[in-house]
């Protein structure tokens, strides 16, 4: 008789929202942690959204997923993160009309301070944290700084959506299949300052540098399309990306736990150790591989002046956000 794998406790904040709704059923089906890992789901919401989260929990029950052992709904972070192995921090304060950037950072600083402290106190020793709620990089920075007993590299922010968007645009432009594109990189912030880099990519039997030689397409089409794709989707749908964001979050954790494909890498925002001139501690996106369940930044990539300028601009954006939340006392 074979021994059953140890169940994974997965906590999803903002579970009643559209990204959470799009992610939860795929997580329960095994898309995130693989077909052999049983799941215990913890749905964490603010009190006004608990009823909606309970409705989602009912639907999860009704789906009778073989891997799903149980579902709990909480509004107390200490209960929601108790023993969690994987935390998807999707819930955040969205920017409302007329809201100043400082107000947005302050509102989210409070949320992610509380969540970081709760994770520090009650999560599993090997917890992995993915921040999806925007401003994701700085929210991850705040959470990590409020969880001093958790290794900083366990706190990451989502740039896999930007990474996937870049691959899709490159496929459309080149005629290559998505599966034949590798080694794309997103640098910097998950914002309009991000830099999607294809200079080291492989596109079928072509190099990304060869395709990037068309600078008019690169600077006038590719980079702005990827960087502003979220706004274009809001304009078209009337609401923000949900299914694609959920898919990217699942991709991110899947590769973190189970490994990146041989010969390829992905993009993850994580605390810098000083690589590529990014200030230490800043949560910035890098090219990474997952090795034995841990992210490792791909080293030794040549960065030309074209790329350096764009990386530096996005890093400056991150430094501005970091300085703002530091001034508010969140880090």
Curated annotation (Swiss-Prot):
It catalyses: (S)-malate + NAD(+) = oxaloacetate + NADH + H(+). It is an enzyme of class 1 (oxidoreductase). One of its GO terms (molecular function) is L-malate dehydrogenase (NAD+) activity. NAD(+) binds at residues 14-20, 108, 115, 132-134. Substrate binds at residues 95, 101, 134, 165. Keywords: NAD, Oxidoreductase, Tricarboxylic acid cycle. InterPro entries: L-lactate/malate_DH, Lactate/malate_DH_C, Lactate/malate_DH_N, Lactate_DH/Glyco_Ohase_4_C, Malate_DH_AS, Malate_DH_type2, NAD(P)-bd_dom_sf. The keyword NAD applies. SUPFAM superfamilies: LDH C-terminal domain-like (SSF56327), NAD(P)-binding Rossmann-fold domains (SSF51735). The active site is at residue 190. GO terms for biological process: malate metabolic process; tricarboxylic acid cycle. Its EC number is 1.1.1.37. HAMAP family: Malate_dehydrog_2 (MF_01517). NCBIfam families: MalateDH-SF1, PRK05442.1. Belongs to the LDH/MDH superfamily. MDH type 2 family. Catalyzes the reversible oxidation of malate to oxaloacetate. This is Malate dehydrogenase. It comes from Rhodococcus opacus (strain B4).
């Amino acid at each position: 008789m074979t021994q059953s794998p140890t169940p994974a406790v997965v906590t999803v904040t903002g579970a009643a929202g559209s990204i959470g709704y799009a992610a939860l059923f795929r997580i329960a089906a095994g898309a995130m942690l693989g077909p052999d890992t049983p799941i215990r789901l913890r749905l964490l919401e603010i009190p006004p959204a608990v009823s909606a989260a309970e409705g989602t929990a009912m639907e999860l029950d009704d789906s009778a997923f073989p891997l799903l052992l149980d579902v709990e709904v909480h509004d107390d972070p200490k209960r929601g993160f108790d023993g969690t192995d994987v935390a998807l921090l999707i819930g955040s304060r969205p920017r409302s009309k007329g809201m100043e950037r400082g107000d947005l950072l302050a509102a989210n600083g409070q949320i992610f301070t509380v969540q970081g402290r709760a994770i520090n106190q009650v999560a599993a020793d090997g917890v992995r944290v993915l921040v999806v709620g925007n401003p994701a990089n700085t929210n991850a920075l705040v959470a990590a700084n409020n969880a001093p007993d958790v290794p900083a590299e366990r706190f990451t922010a989502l740039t896999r959506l930007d990474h996937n968007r870049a691959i899709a645009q490159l496929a459309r432009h080149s005629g290559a299949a998505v599966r034949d594109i590798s080694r794309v990189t997103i640098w910097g912030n998950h914002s309009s300052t991000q830099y999607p880099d294809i200079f080291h990519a492989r596109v079928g039997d072509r190099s990304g540098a060869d395709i990037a030689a068309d600078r008019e397409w690169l600077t006038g089409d590719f980079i702005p399309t990827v960087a502003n794709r979220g706004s274009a989707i809001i304009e078209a749908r009337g609401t923000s990306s949900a299914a694609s964001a959920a898919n990217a979050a699942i991709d991110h954790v899947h590769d973190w736990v189970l490994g990146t494909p041989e010969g390829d890498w992905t993009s993850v925002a994580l605390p810098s150790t000083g690589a590529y001139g990014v200030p230490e501690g800043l949560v910035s996106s890098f090219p990474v591989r997952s090795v034995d369940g841990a992210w490792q930044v791909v080293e030794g990539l040549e960065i030309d002046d074209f790329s350096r300028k764009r990386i530096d601009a996005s890093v400056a954006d991150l430094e501005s956000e970091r300085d703002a939340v530091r001034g508010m006392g969140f880090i």
